[in-house]
């Protein structure tokens, strides 16, 4: 549907002749009409609208109401106008849609007139000429449905009654409003955020400014909101994080697989799972079939497991995929930089467990694995808060196990308890980062799933050769890669607030060493040092620009480069280098080999990728501004 909305002093029309063989039947009174102080709504119903007329009506009414509220009038003139489109719908459907729009608006209390359909008409109007006086809209069928179509699980999640507690490492379970949060201010912020359940973003978080200034990540106007572009430095960081988490999970014992990004709505197992998983989906049409873009790797991995022959000897069986991408059509007002996206990269491991005992053993191991993974990216337990969620029955039967989880993290944790189980899991934890706006985002998470082995037909053969349904664990040891980047940047924003220098973890620094010759005379020596560093798998570059030395140092500081080397006559003659360390803001004279040894020791065990930009600073494009 195409709509042209004109705020007018008046609109009047007069029927002249038939435009269709069978136009709408009208009375004598309908051959002329006029409204003053009116929003004139010229409308073309298109062929594509026939796929979903109800949603077209709903969406059109919503758009008209929004404009009416802005121009502050109660008078609306619905005017059929075929000239807005070359792909017109059938007259019968078009008239039905226009009548329904008219009736919907009348039912909402507006003063509505509709010009007759299927006639040539003369009309006059007087556009008011203010900034909102002339607007146009294009409405696509199904668009409103995608926004409003909410899985049953999401509705239930909003209705679910939760009981909130704080659990101490000593095993004391305290109602959240009776807990003394002294010394646990971050936990208090997290508890408030979880209990209030408001995800609306009204202020830009600090990490957004950092990601833009550092030329890491940017918004992409050519895509749907919540889909981002990555510049070379940002892509390097993201790629290293992807490799790091993948290496950790494979080292833990998972088998890596790859699965499709879209799945059939009508697949019986998938259809049932959709109604148990609280997420909004992107919808794709292929011919007459509807598909949804995956929001996790569960679907593909479960379908692989369904077709596999699994013995009790294989258990626990771990399968892993790094999804690039997973998709969730989050509400527009909840999208926020790297924290909440519609397309994201999710490390996703699923484990087949023999029984609850084995599942709980794996759960605890994966809890510890998640702590280890976050430690590697510079996040310690002081940087995140723990939420553990379960039913009252699970708590009564497994108190010691839950208390042990609080003991492992070594601080009080937030408990969400339900009287009965609604979700497919019986136990879940998340490590949550609380940012500078007191918003929380889940990073690592593990769940014990008691439903999906039966739903998908996943079985294993026990010691007697009997086919049994296992339990399943869902684990992301880091959470979405984008959220890890968000947490790293938000942590550095907190450090900056305290007047300290921000830093990337050394292994993630896009440029680890910047070499600055004091003049062009020493450029070759600077390149020689850079070559030695690069040969040792250290990312180094040379600032060869014709700028003042202090300016070059300042700009290297702005890029958070951990080591800055200045070379001149003394360094060349003595064979040493003068290094400024960002970590302690001190200057040292050392041998190149000693610097290589230091950096290699600090980055040992982490993945490496070459420098993402040209070796000479003068050869780099500017990606922003």
Swiss-Prot record:
Pfam families: HGTP_anticodon, tRNA-synt_2b, tRNA-Thr_ED
UniProt KW keywords: Aminoacyl-tRNA synthetase, ATP-binding, Cytoplasm, Ligase, Metal-binding, Nucleotide-binding, Protein biosynthesis, RNA-binding, tRNA-binding, Zinc
Subcellular location: Cytoplasm
UniProt GO MF annotations: ATP binding; threonine-tRNA ligase activity; tRNA binding; zinc ion binding
Top EC class for this record: ligase
Keyword hit for Cytoplasm: yes
Region (Editing domain) location: 1-147
GO CC annotations on file: cytoplasm
Record region (Catalytic): 206-505
RNA-binding keyword on record: yes
Cystine connections: none
Enzyme Commission code(s) on record: 6.1.1.3
GO terms of biological process kind: threonyl-tRNA aminoacylation
Catalytically driven reaction(s): tRNA(Thr) + L-threonine + ATP = L-threonyl-tRNA(Thr) + AMP + diphosphate + H(+)
Gene: thrS
Primary role: Catalyzes the attachment of threonine to tRNA(Thr) in a two-step reaction: L-threonine is first activated by ATP to form Thr-AMP and then transferred to the acceptor end of tRNA(Thr). Also edits incorrectly charged L-seryl-tRNA(Thr).
Domain notes: The N-terminal domain is an archaea-specific tRNA-editing domain that hydrolyzes incorrectly charged L-seryl-tRNA(Thr). Catalysis of tRNA editing is performed by the charged tRNA itself.
Co-factor note (free text): Binds 1 zinc ion per subunit.
Annotated family: Belongs to the class-II aminoacyl-tRNA synthetase family.
Assembly information from the UniProt record: Homodimer.
Protein name: Threonine--tRNA ligase
């Amino acid at each position: 549907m195409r709509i042209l909305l004109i705020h007018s002093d008046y609109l009047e029309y007069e029927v002249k002749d038939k435009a269709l063989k069978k136009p709408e039947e009208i009375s004598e009174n309908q051959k002329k009409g006029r409204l003053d102080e009116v929003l004139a709504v010229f409308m073309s119903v298109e062929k594509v609208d026939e796929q979903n007329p109800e949603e077209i009506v709903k969406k059109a009414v919503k758009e008209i109401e929004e404009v009416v509220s802005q121009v502050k009038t109660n008078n609306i003139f619905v005017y059929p106008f075929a000239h807005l489109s070359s792909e017109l719908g059938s007259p019968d459907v078009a008239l039905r849609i226009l009548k329904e729009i008219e009736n919907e608006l009348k039912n909402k209390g507006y003063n509505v007139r509709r010009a007759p359909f299927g006639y040539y008409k003369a009309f006059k109007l007087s556009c008011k000429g203010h900034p909102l006086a002339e607007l146009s809209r294009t409405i696509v069928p199904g668009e409103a449905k995608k926004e409003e179509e909410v899985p049953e699980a999401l509705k239930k999640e909003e209705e679910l009654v939760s009981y909130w507690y704080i659990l101490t490492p000593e095993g004391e379970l305290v109602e959240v409003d009776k807990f003394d949060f002294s010394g646990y201010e971050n936990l208090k912020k997290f508890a408030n955020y979880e209990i209030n359940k408001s995800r609306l973003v009204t202020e830009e978080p600090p990490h957004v400014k950092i990601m833009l200034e550092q030329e890491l990540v940017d918004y992409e106007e050519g895509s749907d909101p919540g889909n981002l572009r990555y510049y070379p430095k940002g892509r390097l960081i993201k790629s290293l994080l992807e490799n790091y988490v993948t290496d950790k999970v494979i080292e833990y014992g998972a088998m890596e697989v790859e699965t499709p990004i879209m799945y059939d709505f009508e697949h019986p197992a998938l259809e049932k799972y959709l109604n148990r998983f609280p997420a909004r989906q992107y919808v794709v049409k292929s011919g007459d079939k509807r598909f949804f873009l995956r929001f996790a790797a569960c679907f593909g991995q479960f379908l692989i497991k369904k077709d596999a022959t699994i013995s009790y000897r294989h258990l626990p069986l771990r399968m892993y995929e790094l999804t690039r991408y997973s998709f969730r059509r989050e509400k527009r007002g909840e999208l926020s930089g790297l924290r909440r996206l519609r397309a994201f990269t999710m490390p996703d491991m699923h484990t087949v467990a023999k029984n609850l005992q084995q599942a709980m053993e794996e759960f605890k191991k994966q809890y510890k694995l998640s702590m280890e993974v976050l430690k590697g990216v510079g996040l310690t337990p002081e940087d995140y808060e723990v939420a553990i969620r379960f039913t009252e029955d699970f708590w009564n039967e497994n108190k010691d196990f839950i208390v042990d989880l609080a003991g492992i993290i070594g601080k009080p944790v937030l408990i969400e308890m339900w009287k009965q189980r609604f979700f497919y899991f019986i136990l879940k934890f998340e490590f949550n980062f609380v940012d500078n706006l007191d918003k929380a985002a889940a990073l690592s998470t593990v769940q014990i799933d008691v439903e999906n082995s039966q739903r998908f037909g996943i079985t294993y053969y026990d010691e007697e050769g009997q086919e049994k349904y296992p339990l399943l664990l869902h684990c992301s040891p880091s959470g979405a890669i984008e959220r890890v980047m968000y947490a790293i940047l938000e942590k550095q924003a907190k450090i900056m607030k305290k007047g300290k220098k921000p830093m990337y973890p050394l292994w993630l620094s896009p440029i680890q060493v910047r070499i600055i010759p004091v003049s062009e005379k020493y450029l070759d020596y600077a390149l020689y040092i850079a070559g030695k560093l690069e040969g040792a798998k250290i990312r180094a570059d040379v600032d060869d620009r014709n700028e003042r030395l202090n300016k070059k140092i300042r700009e290297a500081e702005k890029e958070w480069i951990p080591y800055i080397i200045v070379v001149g006559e003394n360094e060349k003659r003595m064979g040493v280098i003068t290094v400024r360390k960002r970590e302690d803001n001190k200057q040292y004279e050392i041998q190149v080999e000693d610097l290589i040894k230091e950096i290699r020791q600090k980055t040992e065990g982490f993945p490496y990728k070459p420098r993402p930009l040209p070796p000479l600073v003068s050869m780099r494009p500017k990606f922003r501004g």
